[in-house]
Amino acid sequence: MAKQLVFDEAARRSLERGVNAVANAVKVTLGPRGRNVVIEKKFGSPTITKDGVTVAKEVELEDKLENIGAQLLKEVASKTNDITGDGTTTATVLGQAIVKEGLRNVAAGANPLALKRGIEKAVAAAIVEIQNLAVPVEDSDAIKKVAGISANDDQVGEEIASAMDKVGKEGVITIEESKGFDTEVDVVEGMQFDKGFINPYFVTNPEKMEAVLEDAYILINEKKISNLKDLLPVLEKVAQTGRPLLIIAEDVEGEALATLVVNKLRGTLNIAAVKAPGFGDRRKEMLRDIAAVTGGEVVSEDLGHKLENTGMEMLGRAARIRITKDETTIVDGKGEQAQIDARVNAIKGELDTTDSDYAREKLQERLAKLSGGVAVIRVGAATETELKEKKHRYEDALSTARSAVEEGIVAGGGTTLLRIIPAVRKAAEGLQGDEATGARILIRALEEPARQIAVNAGEEGSVIVNAVINSDKPRYGFNAATGEYVDDMVAAGIVDPAKVTRTALQNAASIGALILTTEAIVSDKPEKPQQGGQGGGGMGGGDMGGMDF
């Protein structure tokens, strides 16, 4: 396909028009008084949302050149959302402001590369100041406020804070759709995995169809068990203790399974067998996690172990094990905390290096199971449209709460971005020429989120920005929800995670600076409408008029 090439100012202005198209649709959602955006869906009911990244992802422009600019700004929103789960609208507003102010200076003759360097140096100074202003999150009250602000709903904040209290800050919290109208929080204590009993004869409670083993031993075997001869030595040793036994293996089949069932039915041994969770290398790691939690060892040929030589010291222990047809829960495993901590640290190391969202999700699940619990928030609503929107707000609020725990909180409502302006201005004083101009571009952009929040609340943005900047109080800001000025935004519960503010600024500045230094665009040439389309239709009327298609 033929390409079109556009250069210089024309290229940059095309990108700017695309940036403006996305930003103007997204920024109306910013703040507590932000408006909704209705998104048409080809199938099903329309989506109504106040989530910036959801709006941004739906924007596709007809003009190919403008669409490139739109895609670049969408990248800002998506990347910010991937890292923190919030701050997408702030990042979009910052990106638009940097592009607008920057292109004005480029058109006036400024050196784009010098502007880019100035913006980058100003961002570095801004990030240091954000970290200085951050307050550590030490109680559930702060988490409740952060999550509540993200979702624009105090009830959401309360439920997420409650779930975090129950499972810990590292715990897994999943958001699911409820079949009813009400939202509820369920907490599963202990370590749970999605594999149930291999055979229903292992059930100890027929009414509930579950097997419960109290003060049980746990045999963790990496391979299939089918040969009774290999398993018999362990069974005899456990039988002498009179305690129950849980076998976790790739599978248990043949004469080994038949013997277990017979012994269970006769009452010789209270026993149950479940398949190991996961697949491949992930299964091996999950078995090692279970071993760490229960104080046992994985019987693995890779480690030189054989099932027939397994001693009692290699078996794990747990106070209670509950097994249903779908899942197994191990409560109060007897593993040493040092071993569990070592596994946790190893998983955190993998989390820092992985690029895959799927791998990250699975690592987070393992981390939570080791840390002692899983909470499920089941979101209820009256209609499908409301349910989708509500569930999305819960997911955003949860990500925001995690970000707050990670790097602390700062004053919200765009206040922190205004408060770091003096530090950026000081950094700009050490710069020369167009680099100093680049720093001033960022200073101007830092005002935009607070201005837009005020505009969405029906106030005069510039008046509010000036009032906050000129105040001597370090956390003085404007509460757009009530239309009042507040002496201490953090004390008033109007807060943002420092990580969200930092990430939004970094991503916006990165894309903004790239657009300023763009000198050419190469894109597909628009296709011309085919000639003679009408004539073809006329011809078809003669011979084919009676045919049905």
UniProtKB/Swiss-Prot annotation:
Query: Which InterPro entries does its entry note?
Result: Cpn60/GroEL, Cpn60/GroEL/TCP-1, GroEL-like_apical_dom_sf, GROEL-like_equatorial_sf, TCP-1-like_intermed_sf
Q: What is its EC number?
A: 5.6.1.7
Q: Which key words are in the record?
A: ATP-binding, Chaperone, Cytoplasm, Isomerase, Nucleotide-binding
| Record GO terms (molecular function) | ATP binding; ATP-dependent protein folding chaperone; isomerase activity; unfolded protein binding
The subcellular localization recorded is: Cytoplasm
Query: Mind telling me which SUPFAM superfamilies this protein's record contains?
Result: GroEL apical domain-like, GroEL equatorial domain-like, GroEL-intermediate domain like
Might you name a Gene Ontology BP term for this protein?
protein refolding
Per the record's keyword annotation, is Nucleotide-binding included, yes or no? Answer: yes
Sites where the protein binds ATP: 29-32, 50, 86-90, 413, 479-481, 496
Q: Where is this region: Disordered?
A: 522-549
Q: Which Pfam families match?
A: Cpn60_TCP1
Residues in the signal sequence: none
Principal location listed in the UniProt entry: cytoplasm
Organism superkingdom:
Bacteria
- Mind naming one GO cellular-component term on file for this protein? cytoplasm
Q: Which reaction does it catalyse?
A: ATP + H2O + a folded polypeptide = ADP + phosphate + an unfolded polypeptide
**Which residue intervals are annotated with compositional bias (Gly residues) in the record?**
532-549
Q: Which family does it belong to?
A: Belongs to the chaperonin (HSP60) family.
Q: Which NCBIfam families match?
A: GroEL (TIGR02348), PRK00013.1 (NF000592), PRK12849.1 (NF009487), PRK12850.1 (NF009488), PRK12851.1 (NF009489)
Q: What does this protein do?
A: Together with its co-chaperonin GroES, plays an essential role in assisting protein folding. The GroEL-GroES system forms a nano-cage that allows encapsulation of the non-native substrate proteins and provides a physical environment optimized to promote and accelerate protein folding.
Task: Supply the name of the protein.
Answer: Chaperonin GroEL
Native source organism of the sequence: Deinococcus deserti (strain DSM 17065 / CIP 109153 / LMG 22923 / VCD115)
